[in-house]
Swiss-Prot record:
GO terms for biological process: L-methionine salvage from methylthioadenosine. This is Acireductone dioxygenase. The gene is ADI1. Its EC number is 1.13.11.54, 1.13.11.53. GO terms for cellular component: cytoplasm; nucleus. It catalyses: 1,2-dihydroxy-5-(methylsulfanyl)pent-1-en-3-one + O2 = 4-methylsulfanyl-2-oxobutanoate + formate + 2 H(+); 1,2-dihydroxy-5-(methylsulfanyl)pent-1-en-3-one + O2 = 3-(methylsulfanyl)propanoate + CO + formate + 2 H(+). It is found in: Cytoplasm; Nucleus. Residues 1-20 are annotated as: Disordered. Its cofactor is Fe(2+); Ni(2+). Keywords: Amino-acid biosynthesis, Cytoplasm, Dioxygenase, Iron, Metal-binding, Methionine biosynthesis, Nickel, Nucleus, Oxidoreductase. Pfam families: ARD (PF03079). Ni(2+) binds at H81, H83, E87, H126. Belongs to the acireductone dioxygenase (ARD) family.
Amino acid sequence: MKVYEYDNSTEDQREDHDSGAVVSEAALNEIGVLAYHFDSVDDVNALAAERGYKNRDEVTISPSALGDIYEDKVKAFFHEHLHEDEEIRYILDGEGFFDVRSKDDSWVRIRLSKGDLIILPAGIYHRFTTDKNNYIKAMRLFQEDPKWTPLNRDPLVDENAYRKAYINSLPLA
């Protein structure tokens, strides 16, 4: 896992976009993002039991898995959005990026590869993309029934109860 400030270039979203400014694990934790590396699914199972994740599935994001809808899906995942549930992903194979908003609303890029697990809190604005290899396989974990409902960023979503709860959970500057 590699975490850094996004360079804000308009190049292909699947490029590294590494500004060279490293972001610490402590800084991620301050915005509610938890990151782990597990070599064994047994460790994932232990975390799932501890945090009450009852359901899971697997998803492969690649041109061969998604066919003609691949490019549209990758573009949709890259729209800035939030969820009303935690987003938990354990990377089984391949690589990709989660971009999350920092406290000052800039982008932080998290490069994930096999064995990495990330937990995004409900209400955090984020986006996702594969890397330039166009392939990632991930386990998605859920506290309740599997669902993925994005709320794209706009002024109304800024007033969402989960967004407000997330903002109120952040430590003061």
